[in-house]
Regions:
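Beta-strand-loop-alpha-helix segment that lines the small-molecule cofactor/substrate pocket
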Residues: 4-51, 66
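Predominantly a Rossmann-like dinucleotide-binding segment in NAD(P)-dependent oxidoreductases
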Residues: 50-197
Length: 232
């Protein structure tokens, strides 16, 4: 959510920029970066690192070789997973569109880039549908509370923050531990008072929890991308 201003300043200083995805908050800012770089004569490259992963390089090699024949249609599933979703997109930093980006941009930039890279053609038509269907207050189970640590059904809940952070020690690498405190101290404080201790049905999230994207490419190849958080 803070890529635009530093990138513009780097361009003004004459630097070539390797920019982490997503490029910016909206299309206007993206175009502004591209036009500004062109005026200043510098390069801005987007950090789509999966293109250089051996797994995807092999897929690209097979597709380009013609071994599969002519590509007619691609069905791609972006399986986000419950732990990643509840941590990042329900309780965490990417939970609200206005604070960061829509879910498809925040989570599926790499997926869309890989699909364009594989097909080597621009998209000429698209449609997309999605909504926040599940992680809403009206879906909170009976007996639940606003915080997992106070919840009478916490031990039965697949979204338990106590289980995710305290018991399993998952998704905690970015929690700072000040001098004089232990990891247990920090986790218990977060569970009692922080945003990561909230019930997933009582957060202020608004990004979609499922979305489909259909694309028709310039060469008539069709692509279906399904972003699904309810996976492991």
């Amino acid at each position: 959510d803070i890529h635009y201003d530093p990138c513009i300043k780097a361009i003004d200083a004459g630097y070539h920029v390797l920019l982490e995805k997503p490029i910016a908050q909206n299309l206007v800012e993206c175009n502004d970066i591209a036009e500004h770089a062109k005026r200043k004569g510098v390069l801005v490259c987007v950090c789509h690192v999966l293109r250089y992963h051996p797994y995807f390089l092999k897929i690209k090699e097979v597709v380009d070789s013609g071994e599969l024949g002519k590509i007619i249609s691609i069905n791609h599933i972006a399986s986000v997973g419950l732990d990643r979703t509840t941590h990042g997109f329900v309780r965490g930093l990417w939970r609200k569109e206005k604070l960061t980006n829509p879910m498809l941009i925040a989570k599926c930039c790499h997926d869309v880039d890989l699909l364009l890279w594989l097909t080597k053609t621009p998209c000429r038509k698209l449609s997309s549908f999605g909504s926040l269907r599940w992680f809403r207050s009206e879906n909170a189970p009976e007996g639940s509370s606003k915080r997992c640590i106070d919840c009478s059904i916490e031990t039965e809940c697949p979204y338990s923050a106590v289980d995710l952070y305290y018991n399993r020690r998952s998704w905690i690498s970015n929690f700072d531990i000040p001098a004089g405190k232990t990891l247990d101290d920090i986790l218990m404080e977060e569970l009692r008072h922080g945003m990561y201790g909230r019930c997933v049905f009582h957060c202020d999230n608004d990004v979609v929890d499922h979305q489909v994207l259909s694309m028709e490419m310039a060469d008539e190849v069709t692509i279906n991308l399904s972003m699904d958080i309810f996976t492991n």
